[in-house]
Structure formats: structure tokens, C-alpha cells
């Protein structure tokens, strides 16, 4: 007989014999089939997340808060950065803010709001989505004006 792939067989006793579990006492693995006493794990088992009667994790953790779908997250620009990057009598637009790396391009998703951190001495015209009350007062005190988009 020639040695070919379809003729190959393992050496005798090199592989353990298969046990067909739960097929009677004579087969050696009958009745409880190696599963021990007849409990929950002998059967189908339990669903994912089941903790044996203990209150499961997803119910122990409280239900806290929610995400408001109407919440608007602004890109913040402070007066101090406008003071540094703009000269007198300039107009602050969304394009100029982007060119000076003060905002990201995603203006549709995150509108721009100017806040009053720092001091403003230059006369500027702001064309942005929103301005805080203190920032509006500081701009108007410096002789500038605010145009909300």
C-alpha cells in the first residue's frame, strides 16, 4: 500500500477515543454526562448578564441624567485672544477667526460664542453667533459693535 494523504491514519492509541456523552451507563458517560448534579448549569444555562438571583449589574447601576437634544455646544473665543490677533477697526468674522486658528471649521455643528475673559482696548466689529453680556459691554465700551448672526 502506497503512502498517500487519503491513506494516512493515526498511530494506534495516539489519540483518545471519543466519548458519546449521555448515551447510557454502558457508554461510561451516561446519566449526568460529566455535568455533575442536576442543576441549572447542567441544562441550557442562563441568559447573558444573569448573576444567579443577585441583582444584575445593569439594574444596580442607577439611571442618571439624560442628553438634551437641544443643547448647543459653542466654540469659545475670549476677548484676550481677539485683543492679541486683531488690530484696531477690524471686523471679526467666522472666516477671519478660522484663518487665525481661533475656531475650527465645523461652524454648522458648533457655533461661535465670544466670552469676556481678558480686556479689550481695540475697536472691533464682531459678526458671530452669540456674545455674552459682559463681552458685549466690553466691546461697546471700547467703541466697537456686535452683530449676531
From Swiss-Prot:
Keywords: Ribonucleoprotein, Ribosomal protein, RNA-binding, rRNA-binding. GO terms for cellular component: cytosolic large ribosomal subunit. The keyword rRNA-binding applies. GO terms for biological process: translation. One of its GO terms (molecular function) is rRNA binding. Residues 17-28 have a biased composition (Basic residues). It holds the Pfam family Ribosomal_L27A. Belongs to the universal ribosomal protein uL15 family. This is Large ribosomal subunit protein uL15. It comes from Mycoplasmopsis synoviae (strain 53) (Mycoplasma synoviae).
